[in-house]
Regions:
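N-terminal Rossmann-like or analogous alpha/beta NTP/dinucleotide-binding catalytic cores
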Residues: 1-120, 216-229
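Residue-level signal for inorganic ion chemistry
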Residues: 24, 55, 95, 99, ...
Length: 489
């Protein structure tokens, strides 16, 4: 099989586009075929190099490597449509010379006005074929005189049948398709011409895309026939919708692949989750690695019913992948997050060792990689005590707890979690306090928060020297607040 993903670089990679790329990639990998990336950048006013780069980075992050396309090359270079305009012009001229296309001299403003009126009257806004009736001789004279024109495809009579691999047979009445534009007045190709010429040239034999393209398919099949080319197999994937049943968009929350990367989702979880947006292995299996997906994916189990985007399920699934990681793997995934947030520098490799030790303490509390930040930040930067936690450092009782904790910890020969726990429990007993009440001021002094990973292990990770510094600083905070209150009075 030869399959392609052909995004328009006018913005971010939408999760719907990523799902389409994934299904094409899985089919290529499961069949030993080729996955081609083609950039459809004919919208010159909106396409940007930055968007192209971002789309490629998102695909690479997801692990959807391409066999032909930008950065890797191939036999059908270039893989950007702006570098292929000569092919489109040649195809349009060939159709024109064969009488399968014609020149349209109608002013765009006039066509737009007719389109608006048709919509107002609830009619299909098709071109009225006025220029179709102009003789070739007259059209040639008007072109030679410099009159601007577009090229339109001459739709034949009859019906067009699509044998969709997911939806079965779909029949279109050609009379309702309309003579559509192939080349605009400015010499740029329209989507339908460019995509067909490219798919023919790149020998694409399976077109797998979203069902929003169904209306384009009869136009393209007729164009394949006019160009005397083999028609590929078509499969139109079900739409992805929000919980309100409407097409997934920004109003439903984050929809850009890059945003999920920033939020700490794993590519493995994203691929697993997106694979299930329309396809299933059976009625029960949910967690599947990439190898399982490749071995089992086929269009036979892709349904036509809309797939619902369930962010809660994605978050749960991401948590399952985090739970399955080794300590080293989790540390290697969290480390770049710390670098990105400025908590550590990239060359501070000891951070990985610290994170590896912290992994067992934080893993069960994590659903996303970013969840690690509030739990481990105290290990890499001086703490800033949360406003709602300050009260646990204030007052004579809390100050006594912190002082006694410092004394007990300072006496330890081995600064390990088990010994730390024994020392702090001894402190609580000496002060006739329940352990929970005695431990909270220490927790806030060490981590800056009432909520943290297990206290004794956290203190061990922080180390004796920094622990004593934190406890001393907690005593200073109380002194500063007392002095401040005195000045105000």
């Amino acid at each position: 099989l030869r399959l392609r993903f052909a995004p328009s670089p006018t913005g971010f990679l939408h999760v719907g586009g990523a799902r389409t790329a994934l299904y094409n990639w899985l089919l290529a990998r499961s069949s030993g075929g080729s996955f081609i990336l083609r950039i459809e950048d004919t919208d010159l006013s909106r396409s940007t190099d930055e968007a192209i780069q971002a789309i490629m980075e998102d695909l690479q992050w997801l692990g959807l490597n391409w066999d032909e396309g930008p950065e890797v090359g191939g036999d059908h270079w270039p893989y950007r449509q702006t570098g292929r305009f000569a092919l489109y012009r040649d195809a349009a001229r060939r159709l024109l010379s064969q009488g399968k296309a014609y020149r349209c001299f109608c002013p765009p403003e006039e066509i737009e006005e007719k389109r608006k009126k048709a919509l107002q009257n609830r009619r299909n806004p098709m071109y009225d074929q006025r220029c179709r009736r102009i003789s070739e001789e007259e059209a040639g004279r008007r072109e030679a005189a410099g009159e601007p024109f577009a090229m339109r495809f001459r739709i034949p009579e009859g019906v067009t049948r699509i044998k969709d691999l997911i939806r079965g047979e779909i029949i279109f009445n050609n009379a309702e398709v309309g003579d559509y534009v192939l080349m605009r007045r400015d010499g740029t190709p329209t989507y339908n011409l460019a995509v067909v010429v490219d798919d023919i040239d790149m020998r694409i034999n399976h077109v797998v895309r979203g069902d929003d393209h169904i209306s384009n398919t009869p136009k393209q099949i007729l164009l394949y026939e006019a160009l005397e080319a083999e028609i590929p197999a078509f499969a139109h994937l079900p739409m992805i919708v929000g919980d309100d049943g409407k097409p997934l968009s920004k109003r439903h929350g984050d929809v850009a692949v890059g945003r999920f990367r920033e939020l700490g989702f794993l590519p493995e979880a994203m691929v697993n989750f997106m694979a299930l947006l329309g396809w299933s292995l059976d009625d029960s299996t949910t967690i599947m690695d990439r190898g399982t997906l490749i071995d089992n994916f086929s269009l036979d189990r892709v349904g036509s019913k809309s797939a619902v985007w369930d962010i809660d399920k994605l978050i749960w699934m991401n948590g399952q992948y985090i739970m399955a990681m080794s300590d080293e793997e989790l540390a290697n995934h969290v480390f770049p997050v710390l670098v990105r947030e400025g908590l550590v520098k990239e060359d501070y490799q000891d951070a990985r060792h610290i994170l590896e030790k912290a992994a067992p303490l934080i893993r069960e509390r994590m659903k996303q990689l970013n969840d690690a930040l509030p739990m481990v930040s105290f290990l890499f930067q001086e703490v800033e005590v949360e406003e709602e936690s300050l009260e646990l450092l204030q007052g004579e009782d809390n100050q006594r707890i912190i002082k006694e904790a410092g004394k007990k910890l300072l006496e330890l020969d081995e600064f390990e979690a088990e010994a730390i726990e024994a020392a702090l429990r001894s402190m609580a007993e000496d002060l006739a306090l329940k352990p929970r009440k005695a431990f909270q001021p220490v927790r806030v002094a060490i981590t800056g928060s009432k909520v943290s990973p297990p206290l004794f292990e956290s203190i061990e990770l922080l180390g004796r020297e920094r622990t004593m510094q934190r406890l001393a600083h907690a005593l200073e905070i109380e002194q500063e607040s007392t002095e401040s209150a005195g000045e105000e009075s």
